Amino acid sequence: MVPVYAAPVIARLQCVVLDCADVDGLSGFYQALLGGVVNQPDPRWSNDDSWATLHTGSGIVLAFQRVEDHRPPRWPDPARPQQFHLDLGVEDLDQAQQHVLKLGATLLDAGDPKRSWRIFADPAGHPFCLVRD
């Protein structure tokens, strides 16, 4: 059950936007990872060569925005820290790790074998975690 809060809702999350140098490459990476439709017609966003969207099956929309001279975060380097990260639920960490590495992700922290998550970077350098459901 979703908790009910006394304060009125001011806004609804429409999408999460990731800056990158290659909108086609990064939207393709996340499509292979999460499924969904890249650049599904949607009046909320324009689809030009500087922007792409991914409408996932779960209803979450990721957007990818081309930024000239994009400098990705370097987790855990405090000189270029992450601004956010995605936690993505998986049933089998080992199997999911194999898939994301084949897609172009980089393993940043495998952690303790008993730990329920692992940290990766997507092809543009954004950290994300695979978390055991």
What is the predicted function of each stretch?
Residues 54-57, 120-123, 133:
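Active-site beta-strand termini and strand-to-loop segments that position acidic
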Residues 14-16, 84-85:
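Short active-site oxyanion
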Residues 111, 130-133:
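Short beta->alpha transition motifs characteristic of CBS
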Residues 8-11, 17-62, 95-98, 102-110, ...:
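Core segments of cupin and vicinal oxygen chelate
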Residues 69-75:
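A short, acidic/glycine-rich surface segment
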Residues 77-100:
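Mid-chain, well-packed structural core segment of small domains
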Residues 1-8:
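Short, Lys/Arg-enriched N-terminal segments with co-localized hydrophobic residues
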